[in-house]
Amino acid sequence: MPGFTTHYLFGVKAYNDLPNNYLKHVISKYRWLYQLGLQGPDIFFYNVPILRHRDYRNVGSHMHEYQVNDFFKNSLLELSEIRSRQQKEEAAAFLAGFMCHYIADSICHPFVYGRIQFQTDKKKSECHGLHAALENDIDAILLWKFKHKKPSEFNQAASLCLNTQESQFVSRYLSRCINRTYYQITEKNNFQVTEGMVARSIFAIRFGSRILSDPAGHKTHLIGSVESIFLKHPIASKKLVTDKLSAKVHEILNLDHEVWTNPWDHSIASTASFPDLYQQTLKKCNAVYYYLNAFLIANVPAGPPDMSALLAELGNYSYHSGLDVG
């Protein structure tokens, strides 16, 4: 997946590209919720107790691979059932950011996995470090290009300054959307995502982004030294955010247009560079936001507005492979 900063930058550009419509007004009004949405289900990857699960209860991982279109359908249904105008707009701003995250992941993630030559039949732990390092490099390059800042000069946590009311609302809204899609109570399932889980995940991503900051590279060197004793493939040290790139820019972004393949389907080969995929992502966001705005302004006397065009534009793709999840 693109990293924290890349998702943020995608969202800023997608917002700036919007015409002066209702959706743009809503996002500007509730920018913190939009910016939280830009991190998508990744917020759950910072919540350590959730990560202990290796099955469908690993919320962030499960959402990346299953019932993707159903989640957006249920999120729109939940939104349409909200009576408060303020809360309806808060949900819309958050959901717009979430959609941007999904689009960026489904388009750019195959590039990341392809470039590190990920093999689906091997343990994911072997590629975690390479994956994180490439994401951090892309973060650093785009941050310098668009903000003229180094990673050490960009406070990720400051992009998530929700107030208490916003945090409480989005915790309730997101938990309802997730449970409606993935965790309805049945004879076989008694697990659900609580408002508290979401709230703790929001806190965790803000806290985690501070912990992972390593401007001078001291943490990276120390943790890397310890990891080298116990691990063949470093993980934690590669996730730390530094100002140093691990390779040359043209290699990181594939500016030479070398061939890479989708690890989940090697018949899908591409020479696309990351800038190519960046433009593709923004084009897709523009189309999705057009239909989302139409959904939000539709005046339907009874029941939710028609969402078929929006759901069709979103598709049903894995956040990891970019392939249809069926």
Region spans (language model):
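N-terminal leader/auxiliary helical segments
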Residues: 1-97, 102-326
